[in-house]
A protein has these predicted regions:
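Beta-lactam-recognizing serine transpeptidase/beta-lactamase-like catalytic domain environment
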Residues: 1-65, 69-72, 76-145, 150-385, ...
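A short acidic/glycine-rich loop-to-helix N-cap element
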Residues: 389-395
Length: 429
């Protein structure tokens, strides 16, 4: 039995990692030795001067490792610490065609085709960053404030906000229910109309919307409010899969309190591609597509077997002034981002910072489209446990630079993992 255990543990990557953790902790293996092993086994490419500094002690192991992480010699996927996964979906908002669907980390599918590379497959199975799990189509999180456009349409169509000029006062706290709910801005936003509330991501405005939706004639009824809000989530396609031709997780509309559900919390849970379909409908003012990754299927002679042109699921028939107010608010969101100032294409978007638990950091989301004046594409980015929506927004900016030929690919793929000044103050919106 002992021999069997020993043989199995020798091939158990998880056990080995735990063992090394304790060996490093009690200095059986030093941090410097770990760094040297990474270099000697060609896992990192390092300037000779940095290796010399590590060897002679002028650089300690901690600073050496930090430098490797900043310069991306060691990637988030290799660390497998939060955040280590992300996804991006780009759609043509005029047709519903998916232009790009990206999940990070990825893996080499060629090693699993025409005969499986057993060693590589075992490595994938043990990888704590879970590269075989699609962050774009299977990973689900709360949408956070990116859901507020759904709530905005519900507010106007259900008549709980009487006009686009009606204001709701935000003092920083919503205290009509116990316990009270807070806005991300503790100082409050003052009087907010619908467009301002989107631009400033005012939670109190949307808490009040949820509270009003829940009035059933006898008083506050959260379930009644949820049923009213769900109609609009369904209109945007958020109660069904997006239509893409690969494995996708089922969406989940919130069944928890209406007040937090209107700001994209509660138990709302969606994939990145599902949010992309919703965003596409926002960008094109109400056309909801069943998305498609494929163009067409032909035989060896080029004869058409099947056309995969995306179908229209439904249209959202609301007054154009409501769309205009939503789009204006989304444009104002991006206008506040200093790192979008030099982009010659006008972008509109909505940030989202979604809380899942207190023992891990928040998810970072950014839903956007461009050009603002005449939308062509939408870009949806999510970084699970990514701290701030600004990180997702910067990723989207780089996608726009690439799409509109504003930067070379090499320029976008090189750089460091430093925290830019523009996002050093984290806003929980």
């Amino acid at each position: 039995v002992i021999q069997y255990i020993i043989e199995n543990l020798q091939n158990n990557t998880r056990f080995s990692k735990k063992m090394y953790k304790y060996m490093i902790s009690d200095q059986t293996i030093t941090g410097r030795q770990v760094c040297m092993l990474l270099w000697e086994q060609d896992l990192i490419t390092v300037e000779e001067s940095k290796i010399t500094a590590l060897k002679n002690g002028s650089t300690n192991a901690y600073n050496f490792m930090l430098d490797m992480i900043k310069t991306l010699q060691i990637t988030p996927a290799q660390l497998a610490l939060d955040p280590c996964s992300g996804s991006c979906v780009v759609t043509d908002v005029r047709t519903g065609e998916v232009r790009a669907l990206v999940s990070y980390p990825g893996y080499d599918i060629n090693k699993l085709a025409n005969g499986v590379d057993a060693e590589y497959f075992a490595k994938l199975q043990a990888d704590l960053s879970v590269p075989q799990w699609s962050a774009a189509t299977q990973q689900e999180t709360a949408p956070g404030s990116t859901f507020k456009m759904v709530s905005a349409v519900a507010a106007m169509q259900e008549g709980v906000v009487s006009s686009l000029s009606e204001t709701i006062f935000c003092s920083g706290i919503f205290d009509k229910l116990d316990p009270p709910s807070r806005c991300w801005s503790s100082a409050g936003h003052g009087n907010m109309n619908l467009s301002n509330a989107i631009a400033n991501s005012c939670n109190v405005f949307f808490y009040e919307v949820g509270y009003r939706l829940a009035q059933d004639g006898t008083g506050y009824n959260s379930d009644y409010g949820l049923s009213r809000l769900e109609k609009y989530a369904d209109l945007f396609g958020l109660t069904e899969k997006s239509g893409i031709e690969i494995t996708e997780s089922d969406p989940h509309f919130s069944d928890e309190t209406i007040v937090t559900s209107t700001i994209g919390q509660g138990s709302n849970n969606y994939t990145t591609v599902g949010l992309s379909r919703y965003l596409t409908a926002v960008a094109n003012s109400g056309v909801v597509y069943n998305l498609s990754l494929l163009d067409k299927l032909t035989d060896s002679k080029g004869n058409l077997i099947k056309d995969y042109t995306p179908e229209v699921r439904n249209t959202i028939d609301i007054d154009n002034s409501i769309w205009d107010a939503i789009h204006t608010g989304m444009r104002a969101v991006v206008e506040k981002k200093s790192y979008y100032k030099d982009l010659p294409v006008n972008v509109a978007g909505k940030t989202g910072t979604a809380q899942e638990g207190r023992n891990r950091t928040n998810h970072a989301l950014f839903l956007s489209y461009a050009p603002y004046e005449n939308p062509e594409i939408s870009v949806t980015v999510r970084i699970a446990y990514g701290y701030s929506s600004d990180y997702a927004a910067q990723t989207a900016r780089d996608v726009y630079k690439y799409y509109y030929d504003l930067a070379e690919e090499d320029e976008l793929l090189t750089g460091t993992a430093d925290i830019p000044d523009a996002v050093s103050g984290i806003q929980q919106d």
